[in-house]
Amino acid sequence: MPQCECPEPLSAVQLKRLEEHKYSAAGRSLFEPPCQIYWNWLVQQIPTWVAPNTLTTIGLVINVITTVILVYYSPTATEEVPGWAFFLSALGLFIYQSLDAIDGKQARRTNSSSALGELFDHGCDAVSTVFVAVGTCICCGIGAYPNWMFFCGFVGMFMFFCAHWQTYVSGTLRFGLVDVTEVQIAIIIMYLLTAFTGVSFWEMRVPVLGVNLQTFPILGIIGGFLYSTYNYFFVIMNGGVGKNGSTVADTSVLTPGLHIGLILTLAFIIFKKSSSHLFEHHPCLYVLTFGMVIAKISNKLVVAHMTKSELHLQDTAFIGPGLLFLNQYFNSYIDEHIVLWIAMVLSLVDLVRYCTAVCLQIASHLRIRVFSISPQGHAHKD
């Protein structure tokens, strides 16, 4: 019987360019030098038979599980959460940050660096960004303010996408003085503080200023957004390394903006036009649903950079948000909460399917294993 096989996500030309890819990074964040002492010690404690991708995956799974516990107790990002859950989230994020920082060191230590390792690392970061954003909103009880919940929920994903957008344009991943490490440490401190004081702590008013304590993390997020976005778009708008100032794939530097712009526009329209106040009643599920979509297109952007290929707008990732939009167009014929769950499942399955297919195809092409160290492999700087 003839078998129907799904087309592989990468073409032969893309795989060839992937072999030629060289990792390029610039800049050093504020806390990186002291953290390097800890990371260098930690990687020496890891057995040499443990694959770098295994470390990253373990960290991501722990980070996701601890955040899901927060969502279980606080689905609207307004409820009180047991202190132990925030302790677990702080520990989960610390473990993820630690393992994510040493996966490249483990790859070099075991002579197993590869383009797959770089892609895998960025892919896990894309997913982690979604869950950390939700956890932070729950920590501060920002769900009480839907507009701020929307902003704080999606701004981190937008900045992550922009970081790789400027990489797609310039060919180099740039780190700022205040970057991911600093943000993660700040969130860990917030988790621990909330574990001792409760979510209601952030609702306390500062006597002199007359504002809630929630204002300060929001201001920090706004400041980080303005600082990072300015740096990213300074690189993007000054032209890329391709022909006539184009991207590494010789395409327009503005093309990736269509992807993130479309998904955020859909998310905002559905939020504001919902007759059942979908976002207000289910903010965490809403952010997670659209977060899976953004994680998918962020992964595609990383692949496009590493394979020097065009980023196409047509994508199955938009099916879930499209269903929500169409349902609203037909006056919410189906309960929006049900459609949101359907969109969540579709978006999650689509993300997992794409990432799995890409990893398996690259591993097969490079003759390496995803979660174990191959005797022989193609060495790329990780």
Swiss-Prot record:
It is a multi-pass membrane protein. InterPro entries: CDP-OH_P_trans, CDP-OH_PTrfase_TM_dom, CDP_ALCOHOL_P_TRANSF_CS, CHOPT. The active site is at H122. It holds the Pfam family CDP-OH_P_transf. It catalyses: CDP-choline + a 1,2-diacyl-sn-glycerol = a 1,2-diacyl-sn-glycero-3-phosphocholine + CMP + H(+); 1-octadecanoyl-2-(5Z,8Z,11Z,14Z-eicosatetraenoyl)-sn-glycerol + CDP-choline = 1-octadecanoyl-2-(5Z,8Z,11Z,14Z-eicosatetraenoyl)-sn-glycero-3-phosphocholine + CMP + H(+); 1-hexadecanoyl-2-(9Z-octadecenoyl)-sn-glycerol + CDP-choline = 1-hexadecanoyl-2-(9Z-octadecenoyl)-sn-glycero-3-phosphocholine + CMP + H(+); 1-hexadecanoyl-2-(4Z,7Z,10Z,13Z,16Z,19Z-docosahexaenoyl)-sn-glycerol + CDP-choline = 1-hexadecanoyl-2-(4Z,7Z,10Z,13Z,16Z,19Z-docosahexaenoyl)-sn-glycero-3-phosphocholine + CMP + H(+). CDP-choline binds at N53, R108. This is Cholinephosphotransferase 1.
